Amino acid sequence: EHFRSLPPIINFSNKEFYGGRIKVMRRNDNSKKVLETVVVPDGKVDFDATRNLPEIEALVKRLHEIVVEDERKNPDNPVSIGIISPFRAQVEQLKISVAKVLSEHMMEKHQIEIGTAHTFQGDERDIILTSWAYANNSFPQSLIFLQKPNLFNVAITRARYQLINFISKDPRELPEGILRSYLGFVQEYEDRYALSKSDDFDENVYKNAFEKEVAQAFRDLGHEVTCGVDIAGLSADLVVDNKFVIECDGVEDKTPCKVSN
């Protein structure tokens, strides 16, 4: 049983790493965007290939906005905030940059912790901001390092209420792997969230043409079909007659990963 994270935050990990064995005990909250990816268009890594200053600037700007808004709306019950990056050089520069915009008092008040995934093992925060520090000029070895399953799993499951990803490369241009799959999952969530807030919302928004074809085939047989339903921490592709779950796998190749607790 999992009590920490809202369903969208834990769903990817539950499916990719745990085979759906986790039972998520928290209910979804659609009042606020839970997952987000910020692509930094001018981001690039410097000489050591792991420090990305434009990405740090974008993250620190967003951090400051979060703190200012929280101080205005919720001064007596501040949110806790964590900042994660896979790379030590990025972490050290983040510490320097954050200290320039937030006082020591504010950092303590919001329990701001900055570190690698190792730092956050067994820990959690209300909001997590993750700097993947990956850009068009990054070395391929960097991607191999940041996609180590155990550490990747820790990085994406520390947030209780919100997880914001920062990356300096279009996720669609990433090589096949965990990071691309994960950011694709986040994009699907963002698209569905945006539609749910628009006047043109249609609950039957499909991930791909195959899923739509399967859903229509069941409707033609007289069944009621709903798409993208959160069930115990898993996002079911299709639910038929509120009784049966259909997973439309095989349309997009994904590498299965196993991770230990």
Place the predicted regions along the sequence by residue.
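ASCE P-loop NTPase helicase motor core
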Residues: 1-18
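Conserved RecA-like helicase motor-core motifs
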Residues: 82, 99-116, 224-228
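Conserved helicase/translocase motor-coupling segment
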Residues: 20-99
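Helicase C-terminal subdomain and adjacent C-terminal extension
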Residues: 14, 27, 137-229, 237
